[in-house]
Amino acid sequence: MGQLLSTEATTSIPSLRNAFFVGDILTKRDCLRLQSLASNVRIINMYGTTETQRAVSYFPIPPVSEDPVFLNGQKDIIPAGRGMKDVQLLVVNRTDKNIVCGIGELGELFVRAAGLAEGYLRLPDLTEQKFLMNWMNHSLPNQSILENGNSTAQWKAYYFGPRDRLYRTGDLGRYLPNGDGII
């Protein structure tokens, strides 16, 4: 998508059906430009970091051929959307992380998802600062399965036990009234 937008492309691309955007802020201007070249394209805005190892949210923009006025209702910055399946985007108060921000309130973004990186190689202090146990969940599963099972099972050396971790992204975000997030 970036290459199409950065060049002076003028040729229509009616066969383009999907364009995925991740890694930067997506603007309404860029979406309108792409849709002017490809009226059948569905643009999917996504958010993800190296530490989450994948995109963790999505916001679909329908093709202009299906909904010609959809972008008229959007602000200049396209939302990051909602967490994908089994992903939670938490926006918390910057001074008290025990308070989840209300709609429209700016806060720090945390990601709760399976597949978070274990941490940063040879940077234990940064790992401790950015990868946190979920302080909001007090009901982790019972450890007795590990304690009562076969103590020589080889897999136990690689199993970290039941965990509920959050990644502190360092990004600021807020919730929209419909539940989508803006980063």
Pin down the residues of each PLM region.
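Short gly/Ser/Thr-rich phosphate-binding loop of adenylate-forming enzymes
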Residues: 1-9, 18-42, 55, 86
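AMP-dependent adenylate-forming
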Residues: 27-28, 36-45, 57-183
